[in-house]
């Protein structure tokens, strides 16, 4: 070899090592010139530490002098030892433990607070322990929570009460001490904090930063793992741990309850021992004298081992349970779990007889009977219905399914249907109750087909409709055609003649025509339902008899069912139908138009009469009677009859009482006085327009052959009509007219002496041949009706003056 070289190689165990003898080894001076390519081994220090002054001096001195100099060493602070002080702090009683590293698995230690107590805190703690017991750890936790909840601004006392779950006195004392100590402290917090490096780089040259973050390096190689699977495993592990913790908490609570029960049992035994109750007589007396609680609809669940006895009574009604007084057994009986027979599908549960009713003994409900750990009962989970059963069920997906954890009671057939089954007539009525029949509505007037009426929540009437093949024909039926048919209780179940059809089904060949359906209704073979209309006179008579003297009736008491329709008869016009709000408004507008025309005609006649009085003063009476005496035609009579208010005729005793009061009013013309009263919104069309007086029509006066209407015109002020004392002496005569008004107005009236207009009206009526005379008794009777029923007035408001009205 031309040049001696040496390279460090890894040792090979299979290659034998060369052995050199001492005489064969070269001299050290010869080996110095050998170029050794030895890699520099890491020193274990950072570059800044390697360049330290003392370290470099020591290394260079060793290389130069080939030995270690005493002066060339790295300076190290001297370690001082004080043995006496150490022995005083740590006693020499040391025992070597069995193991130095002790790990408690599954031990979840609470997080220790960051705050540490000092001597000042110990002084406060000793003072607080005189009144209440508080541990140092509890005090540190309270101060730590207050410190972490407040940054630059301190928390208030109310916020501290929400943070600390302690006594109010303790919270107040600790809070005041903490606020005082925090203000005296110069630092930002009572908890000493280590200064750390900030991410913005402002603390790079700060020598007080104790810990600095490592420089983030790029990871050149990635270990590809299934992160999702590991995440799921961690979630599963967390759920298992939380479940284990929950089970342990429940076991802890159960054992604590059992311990309390044991202590109570021992106390009872000690009391019985001191009282000498060895046979249990005193204990039985205490149990008997205790008042039994009522059994409610939802029985309370007993937390003991006798759950199976309560489960047997779940399907029974609580009223069928009975308690049997028996002496409590000393020996605990073994529990029995009877198997319940499976009920066949489609069979309803039968109502239990009194012989088969379960009897709950008081001895079964033990006072100290609790469920231990080995008596876990699992609730019976009902198996879901199979697909075949769901397909066969007519309700499909909406079928009733029992829900776990709910108690279902059997229907009480003894109260629901027993009285129906005993009485055959009631049973027939109960069958008719669930039939669908042809139904018509009043508002709107139409036929809705076959329906069944039932009562819903709050007393609402609900109509359940059924689809039949006769619906296209039934829609053509006019409800007026069904008014003349009389209902009969002997009806045939027409529902069996038709079947339910879908929209896609073909029309049935056996569909009845409209004439056949009407003939079936007329012959009572088909049941037809129509809302019954109440008679106004019946309602008024009932209210008059039930009402006390002086008591008024509300204006809202007349419902829509009391409104009748107009039907013609031989004796005249009878009202049996209803009016809507639009018809009422139209009628009011027509009355206003008629009133304006009458006022214009009266004004013209007054001017003509005034001119004729100057020329022919003697012929004034005859001309006036000739020009103003007119009768109504049929159309005007119908129109005026629709606005007349009628009331039931009071008894003779009532009329005689009112006759003796001294009110002398003739022909039913009443002059009301006093302030007017605003009515409902339908009268605003008349009351809002100035110069137009409201219309008040006086009730009809009963007669043997004919009914007479004397309409009156009521004005809001005497200035509206300047003919208060004029010669309006004509009366209106209607033959064969009797009306019923659907409107009742609650109002008070006051009568006065008859006006000259009323006296002239009575004189002209007596002189006319076509108008029969109105007797004073009938007039007083009408006035008595006015006084007895002040709530019934016309369609519009009050007025202070009453004058006659002429209808043309």
Curated annotation (Swiss-Prot):
Main subcellular localisation: nucleus
Sorted UniProt keywords: Chromatin regulator, DNA damage, DNA repair, Isopeptide bond, Nucleus, Phosphoprotein, Transcription, Transcription regulation, Ubl conjugation
Low complexity composition bias: residue spans: 595-614
Keyword DNA repair in record: yes
Pfam families: E_Pc_C (PF06752), EPL1 (PF10513)
Composition bias type Polar residues, residue spans: 615-630, 658-682
UniProt subcellular location: Nucleus
Domain of life: Eukaryota
Classification via InterPro entries: Enhancer_polycomb (IPR024943), Enhancer_polycomb-like_N (IPR019542), Enhancer_polycomb_C (IPR009607)
One GO biological process term: positive regulation of DNA-templated transcription
Region of interest: Disordered: 337-357, 371-397, 595-630, 645-682
Cross-link Glycyl lysine isopeptide (Lys-Gly) (interchain with G-Cter in SUMO2) placement: 135, 195, 324, 362
This protein's record includes keyword Ion transport: no
A Gene Ontology term for the protein's cellular component: NuA4 histone acetyltransferase complex
Residues recorded as bearing Phosphoserine in the entry: 755
Role this protein plays: May play a role in transcription or DNA repair.
UniProt similarity note: Belongs to the enhancer of polycomb family.
PANTHER family, alphabetized: ENHANCER OF POLYCOMB
Protein name: Enhancer of polycomb homolog 2
Source organism of this protein record: Mus musculus (Mouse)
């Amino acid at each position: 070899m031309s040049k001696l070289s040496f390279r460090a190689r890894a040792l090979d165990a299979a290659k034998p090592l060369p052995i050199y003898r001492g005489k064969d080894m070269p001299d050290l001076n010869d080996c110095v010139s050998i170029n050794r390519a030895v890699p520099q081994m890491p020193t274990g220090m950072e570059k800044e530490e390697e360049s330290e002054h003392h370290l470099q001096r020591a290394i260079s001195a060793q290389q130069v002098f080939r030995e270690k100099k005493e002066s060339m060493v790295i300076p190290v602070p001297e370690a001082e030892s004080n043995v006496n002080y150490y022995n005083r702090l740590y006693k020499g009683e040391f025992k070597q433990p069995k193991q130095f590293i002790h790990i408690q698995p599954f031990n979840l230690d609470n997080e220790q607070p960051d705050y540490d107590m000092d001597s000042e805190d110990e002084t406060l703690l000793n003072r607080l322990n005189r009144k209440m017991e508080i541990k140092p750890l509890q005090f540190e936790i309270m101060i730590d929570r207050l410190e972490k909840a407040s940054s630059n601004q301190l928390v208030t006392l109310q916020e501290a009460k929400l943070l600390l779950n302690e006594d109010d006195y303790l919270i107040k004392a600790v809070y005041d001490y903490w606020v005082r100590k925090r203000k005296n402290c110069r630092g930002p917090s009572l908890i000493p904090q280590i200064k750390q490096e900030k991410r913005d780089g402002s603390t790079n040259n700060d020598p007080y930063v104790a810990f600095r973050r490592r420089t983030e390096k790029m990871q050149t190689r990635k270990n590809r793992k299934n992160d999702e699977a590991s995440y799921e495993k961690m979630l599963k592990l967390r759920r298992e741990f939380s479940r284990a913790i929950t089970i342990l908490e429940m076991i802890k609570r159960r054992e604590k309850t059992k311990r309390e029960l044991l202590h109570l049992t021992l106390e009872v035994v000690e009391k019985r021992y001191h009282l000498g109750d060895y046979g249990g007589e005193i204990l039985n007396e205490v149990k008997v004298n205790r008042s039994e609680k009522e059994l409610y609809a939802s029985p309370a669940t007993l937390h003991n081992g006798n759950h199976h006895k309560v489960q047997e009574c779940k399907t029974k009604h609580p009223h069928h349970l009975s308690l049997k007084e028996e002496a409590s057994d000393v020996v605990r009986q073994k529990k029995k779990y009877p198997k319940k027979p499976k009920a066949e599908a489609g069979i309803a549960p039968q109502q239990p007889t009194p012989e088969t009713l379960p009897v709950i003994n008081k001895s079964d409900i033990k006072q100290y009977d609790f469920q231990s750990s080995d008596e876990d009962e699992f609730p019976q989970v009902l198996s879901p219905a199979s697909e075949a059963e769901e397909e066969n069920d007519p309700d499909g997906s909406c079928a009733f399914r029992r829900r776990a954890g709910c108690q279902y009671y059997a229907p009480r057939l003894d109260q629901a249907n027993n009285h129906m089954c005993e009485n055959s007539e009631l049973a027939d009525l109960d069958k008719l109750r669930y039939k669908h029949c042809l139904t018509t509505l009043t508002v709107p007037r139409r036929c809705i087909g076959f329906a069944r009426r039932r009562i819903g929540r709050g007393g609402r009437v609900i109509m359940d409709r059924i689809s039949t093949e006769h619906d296209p024909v039934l829609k053509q039926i006019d409800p007026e055609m069904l008014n003349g048919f009389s209902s009969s209780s002997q009806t045939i179940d027409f529902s069996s003649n038709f079947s339910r059809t879908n929209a896609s089904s073909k029309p049935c060949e056996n569909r009845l025509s409209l004439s056949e359906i009407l003939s079936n209704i007329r012959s009572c073979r088909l049941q037809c339902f129509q809302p019954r209309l109440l008679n106004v006179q019946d309602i008024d008579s009932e209210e008059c008899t039930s009402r006390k003297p002086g008591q008024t009736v509300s204006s809202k008491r007349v419902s829509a069912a009391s409104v009748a329709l107009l039907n013609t008869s031989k004796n005249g016009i009878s009202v049996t139908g209803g009016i809507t709000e639009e018809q009422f408004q139209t009628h009011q507008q027509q009355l206003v138009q008629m009133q304006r025309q009458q006022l214009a005609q009266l004004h013209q006649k007054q001017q003509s009469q005034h001119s004729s009085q100057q020329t022919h003063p003697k012929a004034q009476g005859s001309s006036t009677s000739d020009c103003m005496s007119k009768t109504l035609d049929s159309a005007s009579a119908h129109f005026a009859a629709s606005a007349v208010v009628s009331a039931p005729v009071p008894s003779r005793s009532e009329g005689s009482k009112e006759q003796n009061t001294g009110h002398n009013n003739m022909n039913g013309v009443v002059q009301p006085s006093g302030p007017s009263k605003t009515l409902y919104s339908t009268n605003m069309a008349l009351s809002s327009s100035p110069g137009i007086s409201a219309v008040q029509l006086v009730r009809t006066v009963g007669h043997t052959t004919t009914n007479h209407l004397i309409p009156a015109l009521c004005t809001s002020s005497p200035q509206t009509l300047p003919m208060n004392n004029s010669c309006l002496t004509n009366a209106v005569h209607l033959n064969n007219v009797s009306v019923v008004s659907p409107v009742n107005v609650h109002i008070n009236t006051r009568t006065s002496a008859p006006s000259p207009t009323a006296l002239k009206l009575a004189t002209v009526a007596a002189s006319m041949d076509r108008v029969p005379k109105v007797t004073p008794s009938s007039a007083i009777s009408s006035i008595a009706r006015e006084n007895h029923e002040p709530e019934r007035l016309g369609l519009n408001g009050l007025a202070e003056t009453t004058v006659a009205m002429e209808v043309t």
